[in-house]
Every structure is written in structure tokens, then in C-alpha cells.
């Protein structure tokens, strides 16, 4: 079984991030990330894992499992599945810095904003469906 550091490196590389980029996005020092990945430091504390999970745009629970803090990951919750699909789609088109994927931006939205976003998303989705039917 791969160590936590090896798994962290694989996740970072899958997202085509450098150690310095992950450090910038997470607030965890580049040296700290490097030590974790190279096995020179033990498993980080849950607070550090949370920062890394958010920067990697993966569920915190999944990274806690990889770190050995929890024994099983319960079935993925719908919001995580949706976010993962959105992330996969963005990565397929090499769109790395979409505001839509930034957790901190969501905190400012109220109910009306979310309903408007849902309406706009439905419109865009319907238009895309029409375009794909025409192809």
C-alpha cells in the first residue's frame, strides 16, 4: 500500500500542480508538502489535511481516509459527486482556475443567487444539449 505522501504526490500530479502551486493554494508550506511526499514527515494533522483537500478540490473525508484517520469512507454524498464531475469536466478542457470551483466564492451567495444560478445553469445545459443533438 502506498504511503500517504505517495498518495498525496499522485493526487497533486494528477491535477498537474507543482509543490509550490499546491503550497500557494493550500497555505501549507512547500517544504512541508515536500517532506510529506518524500516520507520525511509523518501524516499531517487533520487541519493540514483539510487545507490540502480543499486545494486539491477533493473530499476531506477521502483524504482523511488515505491518511489513516478514518477507517472507511461512506458512500460519496451527492454534492461531492457533482463537484467531482464538474472538476473532471473542467480538467478535460484544461480549465484550471474556474471561479465556480473556488469554495470561498460560494459563501457570499444567498438563496436568490443560488436560484438564479440554477436557472442559468438549466438554460446553458439545455442549449448544450440542443447543440449536441444538432451534431
Curated annotation (Swiss-Prot):
> Which top-rank group of organisms is this from?
Bacteria
One record GO biological process = regulation of DNA-templated transcription
Q: What happens when the gene is disrupted?
A: Cells lacking this gene display a derepression of rapG and rapH expression, which leads to a down-regulation of sfrA that in turn leads to the expression abolition of both comK and the late com operon comG.
Please give the PROSITE patterns that the UniProt record associates with this protein: HTH_CROC1
**For this UniProt entry, which segments traverse the membrane?**
none
Q: Which UniProt keywords apply?
A: DNA-binding, Repressor, Transcription, Transcription regulation
SUPFAM superfamilies per record:
lambda repressor-like DNA-binding domains (SSF47413)
Q: Which residues bind DNA?
A: 19-38
Q: Which Pfam families match?
A: HTH_31 (PF13560)
Q: Which residues form the HTH cro/C1-type domain?
A: 8-63
GO MF terms listed in the record are: DNA binding; DNA-binding transcription factor activity
Q: What does this protein do?
A: Represses the expression of yvaM and both rapG and rapH. Binds directly to the promoter regions of yvaM, rapG and rapH.
What is the name of this protein? HTH-type transcriptional repressor RghR
Instruction: Please report the organism this UniProt entry assigns to the protein.
Output: Bacillus subtilis (strain 168)
User: Corresponding gene?
Assistant: rghR
Amino acid at each position: 500500500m502506498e504511503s500517504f505522501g505517495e498518495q498525496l504526490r499522485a493526487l497533486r500530479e494528477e491535477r498537474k500542480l507543482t509543490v509550490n502551486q499546491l503550497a500557494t493554494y493550500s497555505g501549507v508550506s512547500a517544504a512541508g508538502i515536500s517532506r510529506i511526499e518524500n516520507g520525511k514527515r509523518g501524516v499531517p494533522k487533520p487541519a493540514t489535511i483539510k487545507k490540502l483537500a480543499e486545494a486539491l478540490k477533493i473530499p476531506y473525508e477521502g483524504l482523511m481516509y488515505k491518511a489513516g484517520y478514518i477507517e472507511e469512507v461512506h458512500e460519496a454524498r451527492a454534492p461531492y459527486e457533482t463537484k467531482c464531475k464538474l472538476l473532471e469536466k473542467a480538467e478535460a478542457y484544461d480549465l484550471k482556475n474556474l471561479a465556480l470551483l473556488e469554495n470561498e466564492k460560494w459563501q457570499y451567495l444567498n438563496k436568490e443567487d443560488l436560484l438564479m444560478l440554477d436557472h442559468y445553469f438549466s438554460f446553458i445545459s439545455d442549449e448544450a444539449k440542443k447543440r449536441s443533438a444538432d451534431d
